[in-house]
Amino acid sequence: MSYRDLRECIDLERGTEDVGLAAGRSQREKKRSYKDLLREEEEIAEQVRKSSKKRSKELDLFSGNELHKKKKKHSSDDYHADHSTDSAKKKKKTSLPSPSSSDTAMDLLKAITSPQADTSTTHPSKKPEKILATPISFSSPSQPPHKDYHKKSGEVSGDDSSHRSKKSKPLTLREPDGLRMKLIMSPNEKSEEEAVSPQGGPGHSDSASSKKNSKKLGREEIESRSSHKKHKKQSYTPRSGGTPDSASSTGGELDAGELVIDDSLRDMKKKKKSKKSKKKKDKHKDEKHKKHSKSKREHEVEQSQTQIASPGLPSPPPPPATTPPTSPPSIPLQPQALVTHTEEQSDKKKKKEDPEKPKKKNMSAYQVFSKEYRVSIIAEHPGIDFGELSKKLAEVWKQLPEKDKLVWKQKAQYLQHKQNKAEATTVKRKSSSSESAPKSKGSSSGLVSPNKKSPTSSVASFSTSPAKVPDTEPIDVAAHLQLLGESLSLIGHRLQETEGMVAVSGSLSVLLDSILCALGPLVCLTSHVPQLNACPKQILSNTLDNIAYVMPGL
């Protein structure tokens, strides 16, 4: 082979390689353009989502003009979308699966954009309209941020005119709180819409509807916010025989229509009524319970009174038939009312007296000593201060021998015992007097005759007060003897504990003191025997008081 032949072969091979490279480059460029288109569509979709979220938060009355401008641009882009065949074919491939569906979609698009579409559209053409809405939304890169807004305007322009001409049924909006609203169209608005739809072309009708929608959307949302702040989601019922009404289509009819409320918040009123009825029932139950408890108490008091009266006295005989039946029951009711009233008063007095009672204080030997010795110090030093007096008393108490301190201790114990005994006797007297009072009342109620002669006798029995009891009663004597026994037992325990011999003089003095402490109370018992009552009561009471100084072992 010559050099030329080799050069030609190499050139041919290079040419084929260049052709292959060019074909590969064209395919890559096609793929890149396809990918770029997909990316652009995704970016537009993201922009639509973001703007829809922002719009739902920041929509106000001033946003109507901006929406109107965007809608104008959008309608002009849709009107010229048929001329750009290359871009439409590529996007139909991405959105529509088969060529037959793309042909039908193009036919329907032409039918919608033509001025005769308002009368020719029927119910079977609903599904392809929904399919068409997706490719049209991606046709222009300068699309406004609402996909759904374009769908709603397209559907309303086709369907609303035919349905309003056929049927004038009111639109119904179903709110979540049970508030059902009817939108009745006024005749002026119907005539205006019928006049606008055939005269203006598709661009004019779209712009008019977009103006109404943009202005009245703001009003609708302000009303919905003021009426339902708590509920964010709103569910609307579809129209009979047509496509479901969107927020934009219904918002355009709120201004001209009359609003009729069917169910005005019945659920809220029912809840409030149920709460009020529950409160009333609870109050009624409490009042019944209180009345029932009061009646029970009164019944128990009456039963106790009848039981007290029945054992003491025989039951009165039944009244004869000739006597009138009204007079006997009125007589025994009076003492029962008196008893209940007195019992209530006594309960109140007890409640008042309980906090007023001072606590009992035990008398100490130093207190008894200071009480008696204070008089002598004041007599010696008139006008002495309380602080100096207390200091002198403390010094004298310290200088006292133990025997004298024991004597003062015994005296304090005796006085304490006497005080306790006096309180016990007063309590017994009160209880006995309180027991005797209902008995006398019961007897008086049992003995009451129709002539009413017994009240004077019952008053006389109440007026007699018990005589003042002297200090030399058998109870006092028994208390002194009990103290003597306790002191002697203490001395015996101490003698058992001590080791060694005990002085005879000490034992004799203890025995003599114990004899005196035993004989003194026994002499007081002679006052209760008339044959032996020779000593005056004052001397006997003084001896009982002085026994405390002689009591051994305390």
From Swiss-Prot:
InterPro entries from the UniProt entry: DUF4171, HMG_box_dom, HMG_box_dom_sf, HMGXB4, HMGXB4_HMG-box
Main location: nucleus
A Gene Ontology term for the protein's cellular component: nucleus
Basic residues compositional bias, start-end: 268-296
Claim: DNA-binding is one of the keywords in the record: yes
Subcellular location: Nucleus
Known DNA-binding region: 359-427
Keywords: Developmental protein, DNA-binding, Nucleus, Wnt signaling pathway
Gene Ontology biological-process entries: negative regulation of Wnt signaling pathway; Wnt signaling pathway
GO molecular function: DNA binding; protein kinase binding
Assembly information from the UniProt record: Interacts with nlk.2.
PANTHER family in the cross-refs: HMG DOMAIN-CONTAINING PROTEIN 4 (PTHR46584:SF1)
Name recorded for this polypeptide: HMG box-containing protein 4
Species whose genome carries this gene: Xenopus laevis
